[in-house]
Amino acid sequence: MFYQPAQNKKQYDDLADIEAQNNVPNTQEVLEAWQESLDSDEDESSPLEESNGFTISEHDDFVKSVPRKNNPTDLLYSGKLLDSDEPPSVHGNSSKVPSKHPSPSFPETTSLRNLQNGSKQKPALPNFNDPHFYNEDVTRSGHPNRSIYTQLPRNEFSNARVLWNRLSARDRVLWRWANVENLDSFLQQVYTYYTGKGLSCIIVHRLFQILTVSFVIGFTTFITSCIDWPAVTPHGSLAGVTKSQCIAQMSPITYLVLWLFLSFLLALWIYYLTDIPRLWQMREFYIHALKIATADMPTVSWQRVLYRLLKLKNVNALTAEDGRVVSLHNMKRLDAYAIANRIMRKDNYFIALINNGIINIELPLLHRRILTHTTEWNINWCIFNFVFDEQGQLRSAFRNPNSRKRLSEELRRRFIVAGFLNCLFAPIVAIYLVIHNFFRYFNEYHKNPGALSTRRYTPLALWTFREYNELQHFFDERINDSYAAASHYVSQFPDFNMIRLFKYISFILGSFTAILVIITVFDPELMVTFEITKDRSVLFYLGLFGSLIAVSRSIIPDETLVFAPEKALRRVITFTHYMPGWWSDNMHSKAVQQEFCSLYSYRIVNLLWEILGILLTPVLLFFTFPSCSQDIVDFFREHTINVEGVGYVCSYAVFQDNPPYESVASLVQSRKISPLIQNKPELSRISFYEQFNTEAPRRDLR
């Protein structure tokens, strides 16, 4: 919960303590020391957390951590006494530490009692302007929390607040970070801002997204309702065929559809506009707390962001070490492993549901597994919005075996309701998707017909390949690196009879095209006036033959291609990390290639399935998903584990130390592929260790 200035002023008025506004802490010198520590390259190992064998380093070269000497910033962030081995007390009056200066008193209990009784007695506040206030012994003996930002009263538990406009931008950012209570949501916002490449990129992306939707709606409405198409030929001009007051002449159904689209567009505008303050606060967090400039956002690595974030852990009361503000039992863990688990808490469950076959996504009649973006959205709404609460935590009812029947019935009803909603809006969404994809890809396929043969992974393949605790940008890098190897593997199984056929077709069409080009060179007017068939000129056939030749040549493999399917498949597996058991002894077979092609399909086929998925998803919601509701409830209960400092997470995403292999490549490139490649949790652990451990060989991250 972030700070609210208006509420702050009201607190001061109620307490009749306006003089307290003058006691704003002067933290400039301390913050300058902290900034020097953050920007320094000599002490980059002090805030790093080593948990489960994972060590984070800021730089891409992953220099090994070197213990640093104590420096003045430990006063604020280390939470450990420099001159004494005695641990500080959680309660300020329970122990006394020798000090050169008298310890300030903090009569917080009296202040809270005055608030409850309505007394106008001024609460006694610490004198932040005292030059000896920040003495380490005084500070540590006077208050259990050594950070000045967590010494500021926390939200609704406060009895007096520092005047907001007296704080600098950097102080306000650290104040917000010190008062973060929903750590899952905040870390997800930090990661989303990172993948969005900064405030300007996110706003521009959203702006053009809205403009694209507006253009599709407006242009489609104009060409379908505002043009008199039968009058196009006689008039020969746009002004002569444009209808006046075309909106008023629309049919009721068209009018309703238009208003639905406009309502959606308005809601999108409102959401994006109201989200700008949150994005601005995240921008300030990156600039003032993480010390990452906006200009560096497109190129900064996640390791650097993570390193800077870990240096702030002692500023937040929930993540500070040694339980100085909260007990060790309630302390939130903050390291690379915990951050990945918090960001991917729901995604880890989704990966497990798909890879373990808990959700049946096979169409009843077609006997084909289908997973489109529409199906993903419905699964998230029906299952994850039901399983997790507003704080992003697993509901306690799903851990109770006695609630199994009730939860499965509620989940079944959610599937049925979602099915009716999909039936209601599916035709409208399908029409929009067809028009949008037509506008988007027509020019590409028209100018480059060979693009029809390009392949992309299906959504089902992507969720099958993704590993536990693998952040989205790491996964995108891995998959993007695999496309060249995957296309090379698919071309290892040519149909030589079809190749000869397309070579012949390409030769015939090329001959006709050559003659037509030569004719038009001598008389350019023949390109438009000369008709080869009725109403079809030379220009038409030049475009047609050129497109067919491009498609034919894209099917014909390169003459220098070396056929080694087993070697090519091993190369693909190093990126996809996917190999069913029966592939091991059949890498050369056509059956393996066909199964792989079902995951690595033509892009145009994927687009068609996305459109059909809008219409077929209600079938899954009505007939397939309800029968899985009890298995889904059982899965969340049986495969949920409580990790201290992280909360309840998917058991498959819980890693142990020291994996047996240093990298996934070592599993695949050996003479006999290790059966460990089929164990996704173990493979995920190896990949995670490879990404974040200093000693493991790893590829350079872009």
Curated annotation (Swiss-Prot):
Q: What residue ranges lie in the Lumenal compartment?
A: 224-251, 523-537
Instruction: Classify the protein's membrane topology as the record does.
Output: Multi-pass membrane protein
Annotated transmembrane regions: 206-223, 252-270, 497-522, 538-555
Q: Where is the composition biased (Low complexity)?
A: 94-107
Q: Which InterPro entries match?
A: Autophagy-rel_prot_9 (IPR007241)
- Print the keywords alphabetically: Autophagy, Cytoplasmic vesicle, Endoplasmic reticulum, Golgi apparatus, Lipid transport, Membrane, Phosphoprotein, Transmembrane, Transmembrane helix, Transport
PTM summary: Phosphorylated by atg1. Atg1 phosphorylation is required for preautophagosome elongation.
Intramembrane feature spans: 422-446, 604-624
Provide the catalytic activity annotation. Answer: a 1,2-diacyl-sn-glycero-3-phosphocholine(in) = a 1,2-diacyl-sn-glycero-3-phosphocholine(out); a 1,2-diacyl-sn-glycero-3-phospho-L-serine(in) = a 1,2-diacyl-sn-glycero-3-phospho-L-serine(out); a 1,2-diacyl-sn-glycero-3-phosphoethanolamine(in) = a 1,2-diacyl-sn-glycero-3-phosphoethanolamine(out); a 1,2-diacyl-sn-glycero-3-phospho-(1D-myo-inositol-3-phosphate)(in) = a 1,2-diacyl-sn-glycero-3-phospho-(1D-myo-inositol-3-phosphate)(out)
Q: Is Endoplasmic reticulum among this UniProt entry's keywords?
A: yes
Question: Which biological process, per GO, is one annotated for this protein?
Answer: piecemeal microautophagy of the nucleus
Q: What does this protein do?
A: Phospholipid scramblase involved in autophagy and cytoplasm to vacuole transport (Cvt) vesicle formation. Cycles between the preautophagosomal structure/phagophore assembly site (PAS) and the cytoplasmic vesicle pool and supplies membrane for the growing autophagosome. Lipid scramblase activity plays a key role in preautophagosomal structure/phagophore assembly by distributing the phospholipids that arrive through atg2 from the cytoplasmic to the luminal leaflet of the bilayer, thereby driving autophagosomal membrane expansion.
Q: Which family would the database say this protein is a member of?
A: Belongs to the ATG9 family.
What's the subunit arrangement here? Homotrimer; forms a homotrimer with a central pore that forms a path between the two membrane leaflets. Interacts with ctl1.
Q: What is this protein called?
A: Autophagy-related protein 9
